[in-house]
Amino acid sequence: MIYGNALGAPAQSVQIPALVRQAKASGVARHIGRGLNRWSNVHIADVAALYTLAIAKAPAGTFMYVESGEEALAEISKAIATRLDLGAPQSWSAEQAIAAWGRNMAVFSLGSNSRVRGKAAADLGWSPTQRSVTRWIANELT
């Protein structure tokens, strides 16, 4: 999950804007089921820094994952609810999520796990400057 405010087009990532749109439209931030599914995440500026480093230093054909941590979707929806001054986030079923977000978004993006480790990036000398998606939501989400 890449988060942060980008400067180019499109200026939004996928998951967090979908969660925010739904929360604003309904007045309730939501997660699917218990929200225990986890996603590795990284700030867009840290991704850009890794691209720059990889172009300069990585051998051709190098494959890298990039992450600065991971978070459960329940914690992300809680941070969104707090930022938007809503009540506590609420769970909804997969069927409700599919009706709102469509099957691919609900099942593969907001209802699944995506956990990686950025070992190759770290071995290259990359280190993230932003480490918390929930802190970014609390302080910078617009």
Say what each PLM segment does:
Residues 2-12, 33-44:
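Glycine-rich "substrate-gating" loop/helix at the edge of Rossmann-like oxidoreductase active sites
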Residues 4-17, 53-64:
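Glycine/proline-rich active-site loop of Rossmann-fold NAD(P)-dependent oxidoreductases
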Residues 18-42, 50:
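A conserved pocket-lining segment of Rossmann-fold NAD(P)-dependent short-chain dehydrogenase/reductase
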Residues 38, 96, 136:
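Positions that flank functional sites
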Residues 44, 74, 99-127:
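Conserved C-terminal active-site "lid" loop/helix of NAD(P)H-dependent oxidoreductases
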Residues 50-105:
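Mid/C-terminal beta-alpha module of Rossmann-like enzyme folds, strongest
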Residues 131-142:
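Amphipathic terminal alpha-helices
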